[in-house]
UniProtKB/Swiss-Prot annotation:
Gene (name only): rpsC
PANTHER family named among the record's database cross-references: 30S/40S RIBOSOMAL PROTEIN S3, SMALL RIBOSOMAL SUBUNIT PROTEIN US3C
SUPFAM superfamilies per the UniProt record, alphabetical: Prokaryotic type KH domain (KH-domain type II), Ribosomal protein S3 C-terminal domain
Gene Ontology CC annotation, any one: cytosolic small ribosomal subunit
InterPro entries: KH_dom (IPR004087), KH_dom-like_a/b (IPR015946), KH_dom_type_2 (IPR004044), KH_sf_prok-type (IPR009019), Ribosomal_S3_C_sf (IPR036419), Ribosomal_uS3_bac-typ (IPR005704), Ribosomal_uS3_C (IPR001351), Ribosomal_uS3_CS (IPR018280)
Top-level taxon of the source organism: Bacteria
Known role: Binds the lower part of the 30S subunit head. Binds mRNA in the 70S ribosome, positioning it for translation.
Protein name, entry field: Small ribosomal subunit protein uS3
Family matches, as Pfam families: KH_2, Ribosomal_S3_C
Gene3D superfamilies assigned to the protein according to its UniProt record, in alphabetical order: 3.30.300.20, Ribosomal protein S3, C-terminal domain (3.30.1140.32)
Any one GO MF annotation of this record: rRNA binding
Cited HAMAP family: Ribosomal_uS3_B
Entry keyword set: Ribonucleoprotein, Ribosomal protein, RNA-binding, rRNA-binding
UniProt entry tagged with the keyword Manganese: no
Amino acid sequence: MGQKVHPRGFRLGITADWQATWFNEKNYKEYLLEDEEIRKVIKNKYAQAGISEIVIERPDSERVIAIIKSARPGIIIGKKGAEITELRQELEKRFNRRFIVNVEEIKNPEVDAQLVAENIASRIEKRASYKVVMKKAIFNAMKKGAKGIKIMVSGRLAGAEIARTEWYLKGRLPLQTIKSIIDYGTARAETKYGTIGIKVWIYKGDADI
């Protein structure tokens, strides 16, 4: 049986970056759990902001820098920065640390694997045809410059009695080539028939290494 490696983990430090750029041997467990809680708070608060990734930095034990990568930064920043100020204050009160919150705009959400996966999940939950949604996502990604894309959905598709997996592939997807820039995202759609899992791989070209 073939063994699958996580596309991001396989390329960390080469074509992919870490989502947390700190190390603390003494408080590693505490910080790791806190990072996940910080991400959960932000994503739940701004579910409509198209957040792809939250990178967390810890310059010291008292300060946390959260870099939010979003397709709709205006929702997070708010009018005259009111929303982002409120978020910073909420995080500081909850975690008892000083926070710096930065927002980076995702220019092309059509080629961001996490956002594509979440968009497909959202459309499936609204009872759209999974085949139509997948084909449209592939068309949009290729139109925006993706070299290749694969979308996989698993579960009781269209209310079928037996769960199955279906996927579509367009273009190239060299998963075994370490210099390939592969973006990977996952999401879940909760339907009345059960959970449907979505996985998205997007090939963006090769890095010069």
